[in-house]
């Protein structure tokens, strides 16, 4: 079965075999070697200076990393502006509300790109320490323009907290601009690991001021203990095995730029084939990521018909969310997928929509 949902992904055999490594106590030096390698490779993935940046690992989904980031890095006297244009921006608002973090929301329609003028106007009203934004909003497949948002923040001295859960490892992220304090992400999307290992790439200067609002996801404590080759709790050891093996593969294949190019070729192939079959891209050309794209359901064919028919042929696609569930479907090209797989997928669409 090939998974065309936005994580978990279809694994390579090499990563799958890594799950068969010997059982390992998380208090032994061998585990801390594994933890150290994962952290070092994550920082190196975007060629970051380890004196300025660190990777903090945790056991959980990508949402755990996002929650840890938001809970720790908005100071008690700070204020957060959440940019919403999909389900995952709304989730950050829910996290901020749950923790009692001072925040406002700049809400957009799900099909809308963030309005830079509105962001600037909100920030000009004053009082904001941070902006939270989703890099790749998988609700629609939109790649929000981090660079443009960063420019708005930079002139106003506001830092960014980025949900990079479904972009880290495949899309460009400008860590060098000085505007980003942290990016939250996970092993089981663009890095091709398995669910259970998540992380925050965080600026050390921001980490030094981290608030402690949560017990299990306390970013400052996790970082401190990991720097000491320690861990506060039992991690998902085999998920760490898989993450390290996936990162080795990632580096050997050419890093995020090579992964971006591979995803783009597959996504463009799928997009062209689906358009020819009457299923156009939902967003305007150039607004989608290379990771996932959303398509209009064909006239007279339900999502359930497509899903079940394609699953019988060995493919899992993904439904639209919320009010979009009757309008669109989504296809991700993450994981161990090749051009021949996309061609077989398109043949399946032909059979189901004729």
Task: Set out the residue ranges of the language-model regions.
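Substrate-binding/gating loop at the entrance of the active-site cleft, primarily
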Residues: 83-101, 109
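Conserved PLP-binding catalytic core of the aspartate aminotransferase-like
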Residues: 280-310
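Active-site C-terminal subdomain of aminotransferase-like
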Residues: 10-11, 188-272
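Active-site phosphate-binding strand-loop segment of PLP-dependent enzymes
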Residues: 113-169
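Conserved active-site segment immediately N-terminal to the catalytic lysine
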Residues: 176-188
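A glycine-/small-polar-enriched, mobile loop at the entrance of the PLP active site in fold-type I
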Residues: 1-58
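Conserved beta-loop-alpha segment that forms the PLP phosphate-binding cup at the N-terminus of a helix
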Residues: 42, 52-81, 89-92
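PLP-dependent enzyme catalytic core of the Aspartate aminotransferase-like
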Residues: 327-354
């Amino acid at each position: 079965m090939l998974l065309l949902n936005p994580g978990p992904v279809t694994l390579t055999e090499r990563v799958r075999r890594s799950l068969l490594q010997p059982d390992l106590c998380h208090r032994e030096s061998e585990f801390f070697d594994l933890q150290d390698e994962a952290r070092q490779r994550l920082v190196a993935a975007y060629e970051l200076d380890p004196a300025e940046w660190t990777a903090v690992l945790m056991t959980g989904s990508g949402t755990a990393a996002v929650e840890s980031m938001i809970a720790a890095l908005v100071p008690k006297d700070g204020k957060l502006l959440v940019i919403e244009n999909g389900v995952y921006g709304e989730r950050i608002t829910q996290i901020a509300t749950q923790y009692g973090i001072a925040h406002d929301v700049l809400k957009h329609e799900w099909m809308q790109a963030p309005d830079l003028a509105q962001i600037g106007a909100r920030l000009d009203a004053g009082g904001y320490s941070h902006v939270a934004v989703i890099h790749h909003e998988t609700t629609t497949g939109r790649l929000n323009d981090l660079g443009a948002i960063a420019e708005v923040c930079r002139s106003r001295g506001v830092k960014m907290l980025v949900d990079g859960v479904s972009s880290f490892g495949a899309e460009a992220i400008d860590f060098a601009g000085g505007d980003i304090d942290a990016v939250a992400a996970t092993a089981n999307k663009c890095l091709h690991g398995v669910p259970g290992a998540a992380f925050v790439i965080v600026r050390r200067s921001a980490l030094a001021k981290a608030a402690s609002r949560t017990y299990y996801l306390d970013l400052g404590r996790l970082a401190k203990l990991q720097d000491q080759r320690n861990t506060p709790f039992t991690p998902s050891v085999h998920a760490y095995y898989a993450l390290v093996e996936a990162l080795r593969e990632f580096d050997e294949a050419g890093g995020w730029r090579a992964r971006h190019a591979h995803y783009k070729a597959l996504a463009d192939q799928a997009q062209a084939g689906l358009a020819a079959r009457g299923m156009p891209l939902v967003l305007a050309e150039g607004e989608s990521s290379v990771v996932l794209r959303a398509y209009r359901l064909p006239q007279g064919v339900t999502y359930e018909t497509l899903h079940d028919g394609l699953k019988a042929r060995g493919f899992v696609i993904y439904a639209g969310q919320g009010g979009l569930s009757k309008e669109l479907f989504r296809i991700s090209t993450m994981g161990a997928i090749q051009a021949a797989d996309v061609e077989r997928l398109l043949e399946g669409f032909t059979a189901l929509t004729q």
